[in-house]
Amino acid sequence: MIISAASDYRAAAQRTLPPFLFHYIDGGAYAEYTLRRNVEDLSQVALRQRVLKNMSDLSLETTLFNETLSMPVALAPVGLCGMYARRGEVQAAAAADAKGIPFTLSTVSVCPIEEVAPTLKRPMWFQLYVLRDRGFMRNALERAKAAGCSTLVFTVDMPTPGARYRDAHSGMSGPNAAMRRYWQAVMHPKWAWDVGLNGRPHDLGNISAYLGKPTGLEDYIGWLANNFDPSISWKDLEWIREFWDGPMVIKGILDPEDARDAVRFGADGIVVSNHGGRQLDGVLSSARALPAIADAVKGDIAILADSGIRNGLDVVRMIALGADTVLLGRAYLYALATAGKAGVANLLDLIEKEMKVAMTLTGAKSISEISGDSLVQELGKSLPAALAPMSKGDAT
């Protein structure tokens, strides 16, 4: 199979993975309206083509939180990453490390902090949820700090799990889910051998280390469902600061006022994100939300963005809309499931090449030269008909 884009990796991953795993990462909340809009809105951001600009000294390098990145991209935290390839977090982190960009380990990773961090040359980032069990949160923060993690990504858009219809249909949840997953694995022998048998243990490593006992998929679903904390508030940031003195990024911002609050409460960065369309359907796409947020806080706080990014052109679009750096989620999971570390490394090479093409043809020699001036029109200020506000009929 010829691989020339993230879409090719998606097609390959769908063939390789048991359906419960493919649809877990591929799906979104409710009718998946926001999931689709993330991609569609971003694809309609028009860039100004500029020519005869002597682009021979083009550079993608940037700096974030005193770290030098080879390009303005980081790998996002993804739960159960180690179910998509054998010790998947270790493989994905190695690809990011070799490329000179950060890898973010999820709270609910298969591989624990202590397994991933020692394999890397550069410090990784760690993602944390607000959970009812504050003892676990403190333990995770202390372990992340001891392992040399440089940046904390604090996810705030999951006070409760989203309603993900696909999960019930695919076998991730719902009636007879464990039996359905078993038979799906049997029907996908490549995955069953590489990950199902040789990728053990399939614990949630960070949680198992705290609880002192193995945790499987059913524990993952049950433990998280019982521990997400709807009482989360901005004061939780103050509590976290007692145990974390490094850069802290608030992930899950879609409103300018929340972005301003993040500045007021001392966050170092925000991620403009709707959780890849996996939490509340019908909210703004990240591309649509980003310009107003950038207008509100650009220069006061680092702005990262995710959701809908599938190629290097999308990275340039997000930066033109106001982001400093982007996070890749689904795209790298597809590559990881298809070819492990080599797949992620190849995807990052493709994104780098695509960014260079886009920057060359828009006359931007450096990341700092990509701005609103690079746009034909800024998304959300002069919307074409396809991006008009959702009507009542669209919501049904």
From Swiss-Prot:
Report the EC code(s) recorded for this entry. Answer: 1.1.-.-
Reading the lineage from the top rank, the first entry is: Bacteria
FMN hydroxy acid dehydrogenase domain boundaries: 1-380
RNA-binding: present as a keyword of the record?
A: no
Q: How does this protein sit in the membrane?
A: Peripheral membrane protein
Tell me the PROSITE patterns matching this sequence. Answer: FMN_HYDROXY_ACID_DH_1 (PS00557), FMN_HYDROXY_ACID_DH_2 (PS51349)
Example GO CC term: the record gives: plasma membrane
Q: What is its main location?
A: membrane
Name its GO BP terms in alphabetical order.
aerobic respiration; lactate metabolic process
Cofactor(s) this protein requires = FMN
Instruction: List the SUPFAM superfamilies.
Output: FMN-linked oxidoreductases (SSF51395)
The active site of this protein is located at H275
Cite the entry's keywords alphabetically: Cell inner membrane, Cell membrane, Flavoprotein, FMN, Membrane, Oxidoreductase
Q: Which molecular function terms from Gene Ontology are attached?
A: FMN binding; L-lactate dehydrogenase activity
Subcellular localization, per the record?
Answer: Cell inner membrane
> Which residues participate in FMN binding?
106, 127, 155, 251, 306-330
Q: Does the keyword Cell inner membrane apply?
A: yes
| Residues the record lists as binding substrate | Y24, Y129, R164, R278
Q: Which reaction does it catalyse?
A: (S)-lactate + A = pyruvate + AH2
Q: What does this protein do?
A: Catalyzes the conversion of L-lactate to pyruvate. Is coupled to the respiratory chain.
**What family classification does the UniProt entry report for this protein?**
Belongs to the FMN-dependent alpha-hydroxy acid dehydrogenase family.
This protein is called what?
L-lactate dehydrogenase
Originating organism? Salmonella arizonae (strain ATCC BAA-731 / CDC346-86 / RSK2980)
Organism lineage: Bacteria, Pseudomonadati, Pseudomonadota, Gammaproteobacteria, Enterobacterales
User: What gene name is listed for this protein?
Assistant: lldD
